[in-house]
Amino acid sequence: MAKMDHDYRLNIVLVGDNQCGKSFLLSRYCDGMFVENGIQLWHGIEIKNKIIELKNQSTNEIVKVKLMIFDGNGGCKFKELFYENYLKHQHGFIIMYDVTNLESFNNLSNWISKIKNSYQTSNLYPSPEPILFIVGNKCDLIDDSKITTIVDLKKPQEFCDSLSIPSIHNVSVKENINVDLIFQKLSQLIMDTYPPPKISEIKKIKNVDSGGDSINNCIIN
């Protein structure tokens, strides 16, 4: 049997209003690409992965962690499938808003509620509550005088502080500002609080998430 190239796997899902840059974040982080004025042609559930190194606080060792990052986009039928299957069992959730779009910030509460109403803990996803991380994208446009819907960044910071949700509000996927930091911070938070079983132990768990996580359970490598 081939040796695994990672010790743990974390599932992370991207959610937020349309046009906030979720798909571009996925491409920037996993592929190092950003297409100026690009058109999102893919409709459905897009999954990319990346292996990073994190510190295991309990053993003080550096471990390799494979991030499986899920992004749902497209029409209503894809969104319903996404909500039904991909908000239920994940290790972490990145909720994005656009700092130039006040409505996308105002909708953060709706996204938080949707996730909390869908999330279920399990052997593979041990956190009793969903682990959330809020991201404000397009900070490169914050000084653009042509944009009249800029979010006062004090408000999202106060909002996140009131809910004890970690966040980064000065992100630019276009300019590659704080992109890596998002995933590094969220992944480390998961590993420090409710880490999943090691990959080598997953197959030893019997009857894991029976009936509720058929899609995610098949992705264990």
From Swiss-Prot:
Localization: Cell membrane
Name by which UniProt lists this protein: Ras-related protein RabS
Family that this chain belongs to: Belongs to the small GTPase superfamily. Rab family.
Domain of life: Eukaryota
Source species taxonomy: Eukaryota, Amoebozoa, Evosea, Eumycetozoa, Dictyostelia
GO cellular component: contractile vacuolar membrane; endomembrane system; Golgi membrane; plasma membrane
GO molecular function, one term: GTPase activity
Keyword Transferase included in the entry's annotation: no
Record PTM Cysteine methyl ester, positions in chain: C218
Lipidation residue positions, type S-geranylgeranyl cysteine: C218
Membrane topology: Lipid-anchor
InterPro entries: P-loop_NTPase (IPR027417), Small_GTPase (IPR001806), Small_GTPase_Rab (IPR050305)
Entries under Pfam families matching the protein: Ras
Residues involved in GTP binding: 16-23, 71-75, 137-140
Motif (Effector region): 38-47
Taxonomic source organism: Dictyostelium discoideum (Social amoeba)
Propeptide: 219-221
Keywords on record: Cell membrane, GTP-binding, Lipoprotein, Membrane, Methylation, Nucleotide-binding, Prenylation
Main location: membrane
An individual GO BP term: regulation of secretion of lysosomal enzymes
